[in-house]
Regions:
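Short, small-residue-biased leader/transition segments that mark boundaries at the very start
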Residues: 1-7
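Conserved loop->alpha-helix
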Residues: 8-223
Length: 223
């Protein structure tokens, strides 16, 4: 049987399942042993799995669990250090050449940690307001995409220092966002296209040094 070719470190933000953290090994080499089912299918050592949106390399597998190693710099810029035994985590395998792109391109490289400032429940719909680090605000646009804990979401509303996403019943049931509470910290990855656009537009001298905002992109013809 031919080996499946993987596009390394590319994800969709469509969580495949919630895993259960069975062991946290702290120390010079910080490791997490996680129980899963679907993500174990075809997974072997050196493959990539996104854990709460963080791309991590599998170093061990058995019939029920896999182990990933977390580098110090990753611990410092994500919320993985807060994970405890018994916690649920979002899991997604890296894209293969046959994968459908159901969400948006996610790299698994967290840009920062945001804080949930409010959760409002109306009937079956839940809206979540998140305050991101100020340096990320320029990359966030209304109706754009963002990955929260590895979940691809559409930005429903945008405020000066926060953004709002709507969570469907399916998302609440099948990801850890249904377990989150006000004040919780969440991993954020902005749409990589916005960062590429900033680099191209600023370096191209279209409007040198100007903040890339929704209004700026509209003037530049991207809306």
């Amino acid at each position: 049987r031919q080996r499946q070719m993987c596009i390394r470190d590319r994800f969709t933000g469509i969580v495949e399942e919630m895993g259960l953290v069975e062991e946290v090994r702290a120390g010079p080499l910080y490791q997490l042993r996680i129980r899963g089912e679907k993500v174990l299918e075809g997974t072997k050592e050196a493959d990539s799995i996104a854990v709460n949106g963080v791309c991590l390399t599998v170093i061990e597998t058995d019939a029920r669990t896999f182990t990933v190693e977390v580098m110090p710099q990753t611990l410092n810029k994500t919320n993985l250090r807060r994970i405890k035994k018994g916690d649920r985590v979002n899991l997604e395998r890296s894209l293969s050449l046959s994968s459908r792109l159901g969400g948006h391109i996610v790299l698994g490289d967290i840009d920062g940690v945001g804080r949930i400032s409010s959760i409002i429940r109306k009937s079956e719909q839940v809206t979540m307001k998140v305050q991101p680090p100020s340096r990320l605000v320029k990359y966030i646009a209304s109706q754009g995409r963002i990955a929260v804990e590895g979940v691809s979401l559409t930005i429903a509303d945008l405020w000066e220092e926060s953004f709002v996403v709507c969570l469907t019943p399916f998302t609440l049931r099948n990801t850890t966002l249904g377990l989150r509470r006000e004040g919780d910290l969440v991993n954020l990855e902005v749409d990589v296209i916005s960062k590429y656009m900033e680099k191209l537009l600023v370096e191209g001298g279209i409007i040198p040094g100007e903040k890339v905002s929704e209004e700026f992109l509209r003037r530049a013809g991207y809306y």
